[in-house]
């Protein structure tokens, strides 16, 4: 009896000395294109520096990220996760580990696990990653009418998972409908629902609801009482004759009008181009030497000759610094608190970059922040083919005549303006207006790695040669050609000067 009691007490003592692994206690939510964070910890607190930490997808052998022998083991990862994960080990001595998964896609949705093991013991935790994408505002169109019935079609795209689509009547009642759903090449859902209504239908709405996000987007159309008002055939004949005459004279008038309008538009474009060139020439008088501070660069950004930033696939071994960004960013060694300053940045053929200035006191440890003036950033952003500014709480899109690869940045501290120039055609892209406070530093962000098309981002010298090159590129981009080509140029939107 005493032997049995001793054995039980020994087992209890052994069990009480072990630890458990805890992960997220509810599904992790993430939006397509953003990042997700998975946190695991040991309880009670136990140093995990000498342990193996394995994040896996569904089953143990499907490795998302592996930490072993005191370092990451990237060669063990599944191909779809290589270059997209980062293990945060700041608190690993206390048994707390976090994994960040970047650039979420719909294919990432599913079950994930964290397994922590010592030489004689292991535990794991399982959780679910739920991926969501909020689609476009529904577009309602009238596709026709048959026997005094209107046929409506509602379309919305870019959803995940499939949304709940509904037609609703004037009193909010659900209406029966036919629906069709397709998936695009990225796995997102495109939804179409159709409806047939009669005259006097009133206000009809089409809504798409996202279950995970509890978000709903809606559009409405008003069907008037006289939509189907019958007309006599005599009246129809008269109306048709009037329309034909009006169409004939309208075409003649429009041809005359547009021939005059085209000349005015071209003259306006020439004036704006010359005005932008004059502003650029004035800005270049204030050119300053800008060099990058390697101590501020993210570990995946390699700074060479203090002018060039290259995005590496894997992070470099860099010394710890309070000045270093956790975003894929770098700032200049120079700071400005007064005066006028101009410099140029060559973004190459990269599809994503951010260029501008930031306050010297921005929180560099915060990885997720809106690059807006409210947070101390004044930047021009390129995302794919879209060029825009972030002005909290809204975005401002701009449409340059020539896609810019080289950007000129002009800061006038006292006037509270920062202007961005397209060096390719010497045009002014946009001017932001704000009241600056404190030190400002030139800022570059290089957010994504592209092995095939990625090129370095370079701080360029401001020289007369660059101005001649820009004039040659502008002549190539905007040739003096026939009227038909000039007309197509004249439809390009003018760029506004913006204020916050």
UniProtKB/Swiss-Prot annotation:
UniProt-listed Pfam families: C2-set_3 (PF22705), PRY (PF13765), SPRY (PF00622), V-set (PF07686)
Tissue specificity remark: Expressed in neutrophils. Isoforms 1 and 5 are expressed at high levels in the colon, lung,testis, lymph nodes and thyroid tissue. Isoform 5, but not isoform 1, is detected in spleen.
PROSITE patterns linked: B302_SPRY, IG_LIKE
Keyword entries, A-Z: Adaptive immunity, Disulfide bond, Glycoprotein, Immunity, Immunoglobulin domain, Membrane, Repeat, Signal, Transmembrane, Transmembrane helix
Signal peptide location: 1-17
Compositionally biased tracts (Polar residues): 479-492
Subcellular location: Membrane
One GO CC term on file: plasma membrane
Extracellular-facing ranges: 18-238
Expression triggers: Down-regulated in neutrophils after treatment with LPS and TNF.
InterPro entries according to UniProt: B30.2/SPRY, B30.2/SPRY_sf, BTN3A2-like_Ig-C, Butyrophylin_SPRY, ConA-like_dom_sf, Ig-like_dom, Ig-like_dom_sf, Ig-like_fold
Disulfide bonds: 40-114, 154-206
Molecular function via GO: signaling receptor binding
Cytoplasmic topology ranges: 260-500
Transmembrane segments: 239-259
Membrane topology annotation: Single-pass type I membrane protein
Functional description taken from the UniProt entry: May stimulate primary immune response. Acts on T-cell stimulated sub-optimally through the TCR/CD3 complex stimulating their proliferation and cytokine production.
Name this protein carries in UniProt: Butyrophilin-like protein 8
Lineage: Eukaryota, Metazoa, Chordata, Craniata, Vertebrata
């Amino acid at each position: 009896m005493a032997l049995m009691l001793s054995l039980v007490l020994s087992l209890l003592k052994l069990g009480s000395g072990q630890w458990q692994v805890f992960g997220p206690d509810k599904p992790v939510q993430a939006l397509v294109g953003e990042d997700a964070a998975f946190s695991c910890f040991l309880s009670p607190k136990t140093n995990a520096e000498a342990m193996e930490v394995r994040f896996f997808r569904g089953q143990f052998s499907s490795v998302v990220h592996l930490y072993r022998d005191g370092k990451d083991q990237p060669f063990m990862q599944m191909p779809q996760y290589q270059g997209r994960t980062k293990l945060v080990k700041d608190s690993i001595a206390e048994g707390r580990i976090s994994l960040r998964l970047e650039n979420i896609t719909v294919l990432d949705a599913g079950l994930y696990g964290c397994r922590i093991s010592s030489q004689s013991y292991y535990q794991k935790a399982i959780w679910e990653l739920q991926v969501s994408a909020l689609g476009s505002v529904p577009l309602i169109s009238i596709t026709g009418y048959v026997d005094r019935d209107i046929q409506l079609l509602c379309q919305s795209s870019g959803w995940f998972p499939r949304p709940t689509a509904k037609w609703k009547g004037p009193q909010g009642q659900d209406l029966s409908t036919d629906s069709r759903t397709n998936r695009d090449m990225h796995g997102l859902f495109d939804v179409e629902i159709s409806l047939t209504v009669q005259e006097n239908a009133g206000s009809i709405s089409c809504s798409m609801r996202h279950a995970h996000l509890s978000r709903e987007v809606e559009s409405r159309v008003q069907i008037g009482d006289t939509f189907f008002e019958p007309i006599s055939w005599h009246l129809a004949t008269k109306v048709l004759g009037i329309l034909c005459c009006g169409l004939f004279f309208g075409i003649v008038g429009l041809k005359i009008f547009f021939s005059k309008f085209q000349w005015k538009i071209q003259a306006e474009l020439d004036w704006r181009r010359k005005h932008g060139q004059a502003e650029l020439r004035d800005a270049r008088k204030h050119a300053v030497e800008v060099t990058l501070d390697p101590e501020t660069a993210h570990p995946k950004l390699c700074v060479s000759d203090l002018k060039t930033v290259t995005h590496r696939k894997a992070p470099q071994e860099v010394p710890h610094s309070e000045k270093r960004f956790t975003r894929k960013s770098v700032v200049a060694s120079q700071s400005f608190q007064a005066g006028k300053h101009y410099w140029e940045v060559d973004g190459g053929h990269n599809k994503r970059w951010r260029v501008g200035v930031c306050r010297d006191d921005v929180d560099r440890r915060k990885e997720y922040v809106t690059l807006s003036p409210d947070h101390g950033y004044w930047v021009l952003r390129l995302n794919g083919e879209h060029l825009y500014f972030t002005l909290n709480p809204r975005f401002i899109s701009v449409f340059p005549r020539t896609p810019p690869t080289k950007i000129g940045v002009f800061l006038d501290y006292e006037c509270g303006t920062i202007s961005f120039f397209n060096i390719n055609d010497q045009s002014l892209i946009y001017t932001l207006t704000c009241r600056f406070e404190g030190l400002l530093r030139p800022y570059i962000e290089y957010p994504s790695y592209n092995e095939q098309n990625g090129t370095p981002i370079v701080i360029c010298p401001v020289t007369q040669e660059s101005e001649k090159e820009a004039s040659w590129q502008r002549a190539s981009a905007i040739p003096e050609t026939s009227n038909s080509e000039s007309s197509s140029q004249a439809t390009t939107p003018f760029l506004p000067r913006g204020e916050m």
